[in-house]
Amino acid sequence: MSRFLLVCIGGAIGTGIRYLVAITAPRLFGTAFPYGTLAVNFVGSFLLGAILHLGLATTLISPTMRLVLASGIMGGLTTYSTLNYETLEYVSQGAFWLAGLNIVATVTLCLLAGALGVTSARWLLGS
């Protein structure tokens, strides 16, 4: 199977997971803040950090599998465009503090999650 098709399949899986989170998060946490978008970006950043470190530092994840997991599944799971849309919606409603919070929380937490993913992978490898 071609790498292109594998990435497409991975993207479909990631997108399906994102959709499930998007319909579940408002029921669990309400609609005052886009918790679903924050959650998929946070988890995706953590997993991407771990996947890339494990794939580059070891032979545990082959280059093809790394491509499927990172570009496919994590690419489909995470969503920068939804972050932008939700932030612009806050701005159009005059909720500037929520717009700012959305940007700062996402960027800060996702950077931390990515670093935690790499650190966790290093810990698993004992390095």
Please state what every model-predicted region is.
Residues 1-127:
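Membrane-interface helix-loop junctions in multi-pass transporters/channels
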